């Protein structure tokens, strides 16, 4: 994947610059946020930042080896994307941590998705983080830091990684897909600053269908007979109702912003005229949006999907007509 200069403008680079300048580089960092792809990318760039002697040049042997994943002193775990870190991995990490680096002054261990590591594996790593070798450094990433032992977190420098700007997401999508600039706006809006989500929806053949369905629901749900029609269409995306509701929330917000004349906040401006002419009132849109949030909570709590979808559409229609 092509990431451009995302690291150079990141919060992590600012922190790393300060730590390196003051010679206060920590032995362990925990990078946490919502975006798995971005976190894993940052961890690798951070390793380049620490080891490259030419300010993250990207072309020296150190940078090239780290990028290809073949640097002897930059070791990534888990070794494959379909695995989580287990005790056997940590045994190997601990053993290698006490071996002097082969090419650099420091050995860096990147532990991606550490919140998915087993409790046994986390406990096994704890002693090494408590008494770290002077020549080893650890970079952990996590999208759910609450699943990491507090004793582990307390021995790391924690860096909260924010989501990206829409322009950065747009550039990422254009660099990593066949989409044209005129086509990219709906994908950027639905990515919500998240590279992981951006990649998923760009690669998803059903994304455009889901987006179109959500537009139809907001603009064309007008009579009771439409409830069964749209309920069936939503449920046809088996196991993906939560994603449909996520998209629906974005469409509802866009419609609301149009009605409030806050056009600068509309994420996808291709449907502004339809939203402005829709028979939704501001009050009804706010109530429907609140009901959608409640429905999303019900899905998270494993309520019956069919019932949640039907009840939401019924409420949406009732509110739409009551508060014209």
What are these regions (language model features)?
Residues 98, 123-140:
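Conserved catalytic/switch belt of AAA+ P-loop NTPases
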Residues 76, 140, 158-160:
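Structural signal for conserved beta-strand scaffold positions within catalytic alpha/beta enzyme cores
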Residues 31, 111, 125-126, 142:
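Hydrophobic residues in beta-strands of the RecA-like P-loop NTPase core, especially within AAA+ ATPase
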Residues 1-49, 62-65, 134-135, 144-251, ...:
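Charged, glycine-rich active-site and insertion segments that engage polyanionic ligands
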Residues 112-118, 126, 130, 146:
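Catalytic acidic motif of RecA-like/P-loop NTPases
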Residues 1-120:
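Clamp-loader machinery-focused feature within the broader ASCE/P-loop NTPase space
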Residues 95, 127, 150, 154:
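Conserved adenine-binding aromatic site and its adjacent loop/helix in ATP-hydrolyzing domains
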């Amino acid at each position: 994947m092509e990431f451009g200069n995302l690291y150079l403008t990141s919060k992590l680079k600012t922190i790393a610059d300060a730590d390196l300048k003051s010679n206060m580089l920590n032995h362990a960092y925990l990078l946490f946020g919502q975006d798995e792809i971005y976190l894993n990318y940052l961890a690798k760039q951070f390793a380049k930042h620490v080891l490259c002697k030419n300010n993250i040049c990207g072309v020296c042997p150190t940078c090239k080896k780290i990028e290809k994943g073949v640097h002897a002193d930059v070791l990534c775990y888990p070794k494959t994307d379909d695995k989580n870190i287990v005790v056997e991995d940590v045994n190997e990490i601990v053993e290698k941590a006490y071996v002097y680096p082969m090419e650099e002054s420091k050995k860096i261990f990147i532990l991606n998705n550490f919140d998915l590591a087993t409790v046994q594996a986390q406990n096994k790593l704890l002693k090494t983080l408590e008494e770290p070798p002077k020549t080893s450094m650890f970079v952990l990433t996590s999208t759910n830091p609450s699943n990491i032992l507090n004793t582990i977190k307390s021995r790391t420098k924690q860096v909260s990684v924010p989501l990206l700007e829409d322009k950065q997401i747009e550039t990422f999508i254009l660099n990593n897909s066949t989409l044209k600039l005129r086509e990219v706006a709906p994908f950027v809006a639905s990515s919500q600053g998240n590279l992981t989500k951006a990649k998923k929806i760009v690669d998803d053949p059903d994304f455009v269908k889901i987006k179109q369905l959500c537009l139809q629901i907001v603009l064309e749900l007008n009579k009771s007979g439409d409830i069964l029609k749209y309920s069936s269409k939503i449920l046809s995306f088996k196991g993906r109702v939560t994603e449909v509701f996520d998209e629906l929330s974005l469409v509802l917000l866009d419609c609301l912003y149009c009605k409030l004349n806050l056009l600068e906040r509309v994420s996808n401006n291709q449907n502004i005229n339809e939203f402005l002419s829709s028979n939704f009132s501001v009050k009804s849109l706010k109530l429907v949006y609140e009901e959608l949030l409640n429905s999303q909570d019900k899905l998270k709590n494993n309520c019956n999907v069919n019932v949640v979808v039907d009840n939401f559409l019924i409420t949406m229609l009732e509110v739409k007509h009551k508060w014209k």
